[in-house]
Amino acid sequence: MKTLVAGCAVLAVTMWFAGPGGVAQAPAGPPVDYSLGPDSQPQAGVPHGTVTRHTLAPGKFFPGTPHTYQVYVPAQYDAGRPAAYMIFLDGSGYAGDAVRVPVVLDNLIAKHDLPPMLAVFIDPGVMPALSDQAQNRYERIFEYDSLTPRFANFLIGELVAEIARSYNLSTNSNDHGIAGLSTGGVGAFVAAWNRPDQFRRVITWIGSFGNFRGADRLPGLIRRTEPRPIRVFMQTGRQDLVNYAGSWYLENPRMAAALEFAGNDVRIELGEDGHSNRHGASVLGETLRWLWRDYPQPITVGTPQPGAGRGIFAQLVPRREMVAATVNRGAAPPANAAAGRGAGPRGAVYALIDRDKLWEQVGDTYKSAASAALDRDGNVYFADPVSSRIYKADAAGRVTTFKEQTNGAQALRVGADGRLYASQLASQRVVSYALSGANDVSVVAQNIHANDLALTKTGSIYFVDTAKKIVGVLDATGRRRTVYSGGDIMSPTALTLTPDQAMLLVGDGMDRYQWSFQIAVDGALVNGEPFQRLEMPEEGLFSGVTGLSVDSLGYMWAASAMGIQVCEQPGRCTNILNKPEFNDTPLTSIAFGGPDRAWLYVTQGGKLFRRQTKRTGVVAWEPVKPPQPGL
C-alpha cells in the first residue's frame, strides 16, 4: 500500500479505549496466538492501493466539530463503475499497522475474494475549544453510543456525500459495509440498524453493548422488531471488560442471539483476549470473506429456526473469575484517573461517595426549599419562595434567616462580584443582595422571567424561561438578548456552566437528553447538541430535571426523577445517587458547598440535605479547565 500524504501517522494499538469504571488485570488465560496472518502481510505481485488523508468541515449533524478521515482507493478502482465501500470507525486504528485494513484489502481484492472497494477511515469528532484555557468537547461517545440515526445520517449526508464528489460510489446499500470496535462497534451496528437502506454489512469487535447510552436495550428491540436485512460479524473475548454498564463477554452473545432469533445472518467469534483489537485483526481476512460472500447477491433475512439463538449461548464457558479485564498480554491499561473514573469495576458509585456517609438533613422543614447556592466561605443559601425567605446554612449545618420579604425569590446564584443573585418570578425581575446582610438589594433586570440562572466570571448572567422555551443572557453592561429559541428543548428548566465556562449546559425537564452549547466570544450559544443522556423512570414520561451542577472534572450532576444522575464529560450517565427520601417528592435543586466544596446539597420536600462526596464543585469566580476525558 502506498501512502500519498507525507508524514501521515497511523496508530499501532493493542487496546484502543478502556471502558469506564476502571480496569483490573484478570488471571491469565491459555496462551492464544493472535498474530497477523498472511492476509495481513504485503504480498509480492499484489497491486497496492493508495491512502489519502482529509478533514471534513463541521456540518449540521455535529455543529462546530470537524472530522479527520482517510480514504483507501484500490488499484483496481474504475471511475466508470460505481464502487462498493466500507466505513471504519476510529479509523486511524484500522488503517494503522495493528490492523492493516489497506493491506488486507489489497490482498483480498487481488484474489477476487472482495469486489474492488473503497475504505473510509473516519475518526471521532473533537469540537475545538475557543482558548487554551478551555477543554475541547470530545464527540466519540455522543457519536457512537447514541441509538438515534444522527450518526448514520451524518455518514451518508456529509461524509459519503463529500467523498462522492471525488469518486464514483455505489448507492446500493448491498454494496456498503461498516465496522467498529468497542464503542465504535455500537456505532457501526446502530448505523446499520437505523439505516439498513444504506448499510447491510457490519463488523463489531468487542462491542460496548452495555448500558452506556442505552445499547443494552438493543437485544430486546431486535427481538421485537420486524427483521432488517443486515449481516453482522461480532467478536469478543472471555477476558473483556466488566463494569457498571455490564459484561462485554455476556452482552455480545446477547446481541448475537437476538439477531439469530430474528433471522439475521450473524456470526460471533468468542476468544480468550481482553478489550483489544488483536483477535479481530488476526481474523480480519476471514471476516471480510464471510461478510462479502456470495456478493453481489443481496443480503436478505432468513426464517428463524426453532431454538434460534440458543447455540450461541452454548458456546459460553463459565469463567472462574468475573473481573474486569483488559489482559493485553503485557500491555498496561491506560490510566483513567485524570478523567475521574473509579479504581475498581464494581461499586463504581463509590468513586463519588463513601458508602457510610449518607444524606443528612440541614435545618428544619420549610414551606418550600429550592435553589441551593454556594458563597466564597462555603456557606450555602437556599430559597423558600412560598414564605418569601432566603436561608443561609453554614459549614457546621446551622441555618439562619438571610432575607425576608423576598417576593418569592429563587434561582439563587453567587456571582464573581460577591453578591447573591436571584429571580423574582412574581415581579418579573432579577435582583442581587449583598452577602454582608446589609439592606442592599439591587434590581439587575426587569420584565424578565428567569427560572434558573448561570453566572460567569466576567459578569454575564444566563437565564432560562421555561414557559417560552428560551435561554437569554444579560451581559455585564446590562444588554439583554435571546441566545436560544430553537424549540428542540422541550422544557428547559435548569442551567449550569462547564468548569471552564466554555459551555452552557441546559437541563430539559421532559426529555432524557440534556443540552450542551458552546459559548461564543460574544456570549452567543452555538453548536448545541442533545449531549448528556439520562436514564428515565419506568413510570412517568419525563426526566424531571430540576437542577444541574458540575464538578471540577467536568461531570454533570442532575437532580432528576430517578435521583441524582451523574454524567461523565462525554455525556454518558455513569452513576445514579439515591434521593435523600425514597418517595415521589421531587428534588428541586442541587449544588456543591462546604468550605472545600466537596459536599453535595439538594433540596427535596421543603428540606435541605447534604452529603460528603469525593468530588469538588466549581464556582463562578474560579473557572478551571477540566482534564481531557477518558473515551
Model-derived features: positions:
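Bacterial N-terminal signal peptides
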Residues: G7-A18
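Non-catalytic cap/lid and distal C-terminal segments of serine-dependent acyl enzymes
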Residues: Q25-A324
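Blade/loop signatures of beta-propeller domains
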Residues: V327, P333-L358, W621
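Beta-strand-rich domains and repeat architectures in extracellular enzymes and scaffolds
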Residues: G342-G347, W359-S388
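A short beta-strand motif characteristic of beta-propeller blades
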Residues: L358-D364, R398-K403, N439-A445, R479-G486, ...
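Beta-rich, blade/repeat-based domains predominating
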Residues: D364-N379, Q405-Q424, Q428-R429, A445-F463, ...
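Short loop/turn segments immediately following beta-strands, especially the blade-tip
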Residues: F517-A524, T613-V619
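Blade-level signature of beta-propeller repeat domains, shared across WD40, Kelch, NHL, RCC1
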Residues: T588-L631
